[in-house]
UniProtKB/Swiss-Prot annotation:
Catalyzes the first step in the biosynthesis of chondroitin sulfate, heparan sulfate and dermatan sulfate proteoglycans, such as DCN. Transfers D-xylose from UDP-D-xylose to specific serine residues of the core protein. Belongs to the glycosyltransferase 14 family. XylT subfamily. Its main location: Golgi. Its EC number is 2.4.2.26. The gene is XYLT2. Contains disulfide bonds. Disulfide bonds join 162-190, 206-448, 467-480, 469-478, 581-833, 826-839. This is Xylosyltransferase 2. GO terms for cellular component: extracellular space; Golgi membrane. Residues 125-137 have a biased composition (Low complexity). Residues 39-157 are annotated as: Disordered. It is an enzyme of class 2 (transferase). Residues 73-82 have a biased composition (Basic residues).
Length: 865
């Protein structure tokens, strides 16, 4: 009784707290119930689908010559995607994710019944695969972008044919952006769940075990011996993308011989390069361009499809009697002469050269993701779940650069052997299929004894830098990529123990000197006085592409560059000639090039049609805009002397450790990165401070610099839009300055490719809401940093944020002129302005002679170089 009375007394005393707790529990229950209701399939809930967590990278790859790196796991939330039966002609317009338990059968909605198809019940394993791929193994001519081997949707609605399970498939469906891609994913997963997608077993025709021919050693004496029979002829398959036409020409000039054949595929997204390559091919009968084009993403199934289709084309070109198929990219370059290559292949005319991974197969299968199902659509490789390797075969793989005999290519393209047909089906849904398909077919085929474990290449692998998951935005996996060769790597190019005839990768925007060294090693030096040997130009914009490919930042910068240059032309000449040198720009620039000299970025070259202010015909000028350095190294101590440079930019490349956005052009909506280079020295901790144009301390953070650290970089999560104008980044140690740099956030004169309107300018140029770049305020540091009073700068920023039209252009030009200067102008043709030199006589101009990248007529020895 005493205890009961005590309980009642406690209840009376704390009844308010108890009531509050019960109310909170009731509210939580209602919230949970309401959120579970969101998962039900109700009409009009299109936007409530929750995305899974981003992919989590796993361990890194160490395979000898494979691009596959580490796997990423899909979103962690488990659940089901399912379709709902609708009235005829009314497909489900969306999919919903159910998180209810499996035993809650009352909430289940059965999948839409699949349409009847003749012979559907008999499709299983390889038979289903053949039905999907088609008789030829690849689809008829047409657009690409997804793998046509997948069952295609019949309409734009998304109608799952089954109840889809598995976290990988659910994650892919949640992230796919188009209904067609979602439908393809659902169809593939449903076939896979039913066991009708992958072959269960594949026949093996090779009776040998292990590696067939581990390698062939290079023998200088044997290489000089005469060849029995006619010399082999080679079909080079060049797979290119981007805009580096000059580097492609340099490669073609190095490998060209009139006895060989050259077939070039240009990525469907690279229209400028395609136009240039088509023009190039018109000069030579043995150079052709594929009449079709594909979007070939890194690691995608479309790359294998492109190779198979190209091989069939090459086999069917009349008069092209080639013996070997060699694939190259524009970043490859020969390391031995054509004569040495032909002699070597003529002595080994029955061998196929492919580089294997060099590890046990079970480890390779896991690292390469061969035990996972992938599908390509929306220019992305989606991981959809696990699968089994077909029984009965040995799976091999490694590098997707190879040298294949014509007989093996014919076997792969034309055979009706179930080995090839079923492996085509298997590799249609495989990550990096070109790195394994040809290896696996050959190692299980009757020609397995012809395999040599060497692809005749040397690749500049640096896993520490090259395996940074740099392709995770297009592949649900962490991949690796080789590094560019530099002069210090030249000894690696001189392989003496094994035959190597090509090397990769080379990029002239990163380092051209190593190409000069290699070219001299192969062919000797150019004649004395040869121009432009240290210069390199690369197009970034061409009028034929239209402005659609330009960002608003680039469009703003290029047009402002033209205005600055024309103003310079009118003021930097003798007074008497001034009226003849006043020009007005006509339209947008016609082309823009990056200009490098001696492996240093020198600026942008803008070609612009202009109208003289005086009477006269229209002219075309090229203008050179050079960036002005703003780095200040301020420290004097031993630790401070470690700092070598401090840069801010976008498009940071962790593999080559440079900014791909040369010149650092960025706008209010960009996400800049601060990078520091260090010399070796004692450990230190540095503080990085970002200051905006109105002296707002946007952010501050510390970086630890170990004794052997060479590069540090960080992208702070700043709220956008960034305030336009000159920003400052300071590097300090114990609040003593080590260095400082300035960078420009460019005021935009264009928004969505149209002149900026006032209602857009008022938010785009006003900085972040409440001047808060981060959740935490760092303004308390302004006193320590001795920043000026912000009021005058804030008032100027408010006025600038309202500008449009000519006033906005004047502001943009003024800001840009603080970071860029006009280094030169020239005329593409005769000009009324006497101070303008012809561009073809101007050493920095993009039309100046460039013999190293000019092809010219075929010489008496059948070569171009």
């Amino acid at each position: 009784m005493v205890a009961s009375a005590r309980v009642q007394k406690l209840v009376r005393r704390y009844k308010l707290a108890i009531a509050t707790a019960l109310a909170i529990l009731l509210l939580q229950g209602l919230v949970v119930w309401s959120f579970s209701g969101l998962e039900e399939d109700e009409p009009g809930e299109k936007g409530r689908q929750r995305k899974p967590r981003p992919l989590d990278p796993g361990e890194g790859s160490k395979d000898t010559d494979s691009s596959a790196g580490r796997r990423g796991s899909a979103g962690r939330r488990h659940g089901r995607w399912r379709g709902r039966a609708e009235s005829p002609g009314m497909p489900v317009a969306k999919v919903v994710r159910a998180v209810t338990s499996r035993h809650r059968a009352s909430r289940r909605v059965p999948p839409a019944p699949p349409p009847e198809a003749p012979g559907r019940q008999n499709l299983s394993g390889a038979a289903a695969g053949e039905a999907l791929v088609g008789a030829a193994g690849f689809p008829p001519h047409g657009d690409t972008g997804s793998v046509e081997g997948a069952p295609q949707p019949t309409d734009n609605g998304f109608t799952p044919k089954c109840e889809i399970v598995g976290k990988d498939a659910l994650s892919a469906l949640a992230r796919a952006s188009s209904k067609q891609c979602q439908q393809e994913i659902a169809n593939v997963v449903c076939l896979h769940q039913a066991g009708n997608l992958m072959p269960k077993a594949v026949p093996r025709h090779c009776q040998l075990a292990g590696k067939m021919n581990p390698g062939i050693q290079w023998d200088e004496v044997r290489a000089q011996q005469p060849v029995d029979g006619p010399p082999v002829r080679i079909a080079y398959m060049l797979v290119v993308h981007g805009r580096a036409i000059r580097q492609l020409k340099r490669l073609l000039k190095a490998v060209y011989h009139e006895q060989h054949f050259f077939y070039i595929h240009v990525d469907k997204r690279s229209n400028y390069l395609h136009r240039e390559v088509v023009e190039l091919a018109r000069q030579y009968d043995n150079v052709r361009v594929t009449p079709w084009r594909m979007v070939t993403i890194w690691g995608g199934a479309s790359l294998l499809r492109m190779y198979l289709r190209s091989m069939q084309d090459l086999l069917e070109v009349p008069g092209w009697a080639w013996d070997f198929f060699i694939n190259l990219s524009a970043t490859d370059y020969p390391t031995r002469t054509n004569e040495e290559l032909v002699a070597f292949l003529s002595k080994n005319r029955d061998k196929n050269f492919l580089k294997s991974h060099g590890r046990d197969n079970s480890r390779f299968i896991k690292k390469q993701g061969l035990d996972r199902l992938f599908h390509e659509c929306d220019s992305h490789m989606w991981r959809l779940g696990e699968r089994q390797i077909p029984a009965g075969i040995v799976v091999d793989g490694g590098s997707d650069w190879f040298v294949l005999t014509r007989s093996f290519v014919e076997y792969v393209v034309y055979t009706d052997d179930p080995l090839v047909a079923q492996l085509r089906q298997f590799y249609t849904y495989t990550l990096l299929p070109a790195e394994s398909f040809f290896h696996t077919v050959l190692e299980n085929s009757p020609a397995c004894e012809s395999l040599v474990d060497n692809n005749l290449r040397v690749t500049n692998w640096n896993r520490r830098l090259g395996c940074k998951c740099q392709y995770k935005h297009i592949v649900d996996w962490c991949g690796c990529s080789p590094n560019d060769f530099k002069p210090q790597d030249f000894l690696r190019l001189q392989q003496v123990s094994r035959p190597t005839f090509f090397a990769r990768k080379f990029e002239s925007t990163v380092n051209q000197e190593v190409l000069e060294i290699l070219d001299f090693h192969l062919y000797g030096s150019y004649p004395p006085g040869t121009p432009a040997l240290k210069a390199y130009w690369e197009n970034t914009y061409d009028a034929a592409d239209g402005p659609g490919g330009l960002s608003d930042v680039m469009l703003t910068a290029y047009t402002a560059f033209a205005r600055l240059s024309l103003r310079h032309a009118a003021t930097a000449i003798p007074p008497l000639a001034t009226p003849l040198c006043r020009f007005e720009p006509r339209g947008l620039p016609s082309s823009v090039h990056l200009y490098f000299y001696d492996d240093h970025f020198q600026g942008y070259l803008v070609t612009q049609a202009v109208q003289p202010s005086a009477q006269g015909p229209a002219e075309t000028l090229e203008m050179w805009l050079m960036p002005q350095g703003s780095l200040k190294l301020l420290g004097r101590s031993d630790q401070a002397s470690r700092l070598q440079s401090l840069e801010v930019g976008t498009e940071w490349d962790p593999k080559e450790r440079l900014f791909r956005n040369f010149g650092g052009l960025l706008g209010p909506l960009d996400e800049p990165v601060a990078m520091q280079r260090w010399a070796r020295g004692p450990n230190l901790t540095a503080t990085v401070v970002w200051i905006d144009p109105t002296y707002v301390v946007a952010t501050s953070y510390d970086i630890a610099v170990d004794a052997d650290t060479e590069v540090t970089q960080y992208k702070p999560p700043l709220s956008r839009p960034l305030r336009p104008g000159a920003w400052t980044v300071r590097l300090l140690q114990f609040w003593e300055p080590l260095g400082e740099t300035r960078f420009l956030v460019l005021p935009l004169t264009f928004n969505r490719k149209l002149p900026l309107r006032k209602d857009d300018a008022s938010w785009l140029h006003a900085g972040p809401p409440h001047n808060e770049y981060m959740e935490q305020s760092f303004q308390g540091l302004s006193g320590i940093l001795n920043l000026p009073q912000p009021e005058p700068a804030e008032e100027a920023a408010r006025r600038h944020a309202e500008l449009t039209g000519p006033a906005l252009e004047a502001w943009t030009d003024g800001e840009l002129s603080g970071f860029w200067s006009v280094a030169g102008l020239c005329a593409m043709g005769p000009s009324a302005c006497p101070s303008l030199e012809l561009c073809r006589l101007t050493s920095w101009s993009s039309v100046f002679p460039d013999p190293k990248s000019e092809l010219g007529p075929v010489k008496a020895d059948g070569r171009l170089r």
